[in-house]
């Protein structure tokens, strides 16, 4: 906790400086060198030490150990590749699957040009970009959830 120096408002020199625009930020503790040289390194090293201690004391298990004599029926990729895996799995032609995956970033690159007339940052005033984002989010979640099901139930998520 720092002790802040209180200004003497009866001082004529201070009153002249205040009249010229010297504000409240003039008083207090400066960021250089107090914070940048002493406080920030302590916080950074403390965070690194805490994370290292947690990793040493309670290491997270990556998953079940591999068994070379028992292969699972279907090998799934990591969770963040589920939508891509599902696209390749449900489309009959692999070239079509690759083309669909290439169309996703190309379509996202076109969104600013579609809505170039609208200069607002508020998502409620940009209906096209908001609709594209919501549609993409729903489709990605649907594809990701469907990748965990067998191929015959993957499109309906086992609901129908």
Swiss-Prot record:
It is a multi-pass membrane protein. The keyword Electron transport applies. The chain crosses the membrane at residues 36-56, 95-115, 131-151. One of its GO terms (cellular component) is plasma membrane-derived thylakoid membrane. It comes from the Bacteria. It is found in: Cellular thylakoid membrane. Signal peptide: none annotated. Pfam families: Cytochrom_B_C (PF00032). One of its GO terms (molecular function) is electron transporter, transferring electrons within the cyclic electron transport pathway of photosynthesis activity. Keywords: Electron transport, Membrane, Photosynthesis, Thylakoid, Transmembrane, Transmembrane helix, Transport. SUPFAM superfamilies: a domain/subunit of cytochrome bc1 complex (Ubiquinol-cytochrome c reductase). GO terms for biological process: photosynthetic electron transport chain. The 4 large subunits of the cytochrome b6-f complex are cytochrome b6, subunit IV (17 kDa polypeptide, PetD), cytochrome f and the Rieske protein, while the 4 small subunits are PetG, PetL, PetM and PetN. The complex functions as a dimer. Belongs to the cytochrome b family. PetD subfamily. PANTHER family: CYTOCHROME B. Component of the cytochrome b6-f complex, which mediates electron transfer between photosystem II (PSII) and photosystem I (PSI), cyclic electron flow around PSI, and state transitions. HAMAP family: Cytb6_f_subIV (MF_01344). NCBIfam families: cytb6_f_IV. This is Cytochrome b6-f complex subunit 4.
């Amino acid at each position: 906790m720092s002790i802040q120096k209180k200004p003497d408002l009866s001082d004529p020199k201070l009153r002249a400086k205040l009249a010229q625009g010297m504000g409240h930020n003039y008083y207090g503790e400066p960021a250089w060198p107090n914070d940048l040289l002493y406080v920030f390194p302590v916080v950074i090293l403390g965070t690194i030490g805490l994370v290292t201690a947690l990793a040493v004391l309670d290491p997270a298990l990556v998953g079940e150990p591999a068994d070379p004599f028992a292969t699972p029926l279907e090998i799934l990729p990591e969770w963040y590749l589920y939508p891509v895996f599902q696209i390749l799995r449900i489309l009959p032609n692999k070239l079509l699957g690759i083309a669909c995956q290439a169309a996703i970033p190309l379509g996202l690159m076109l969104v600013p040009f579609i809505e170039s007339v609208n200069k607002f940052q508020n998502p409620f005033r940009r209906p096209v970009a908001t609709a594209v984002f919501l549609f993409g989010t729903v489709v990605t979640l649907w594809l990701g959830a469907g990748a965990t099901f067998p191929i015959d139930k993957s499109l309906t998520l086992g609901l129908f």
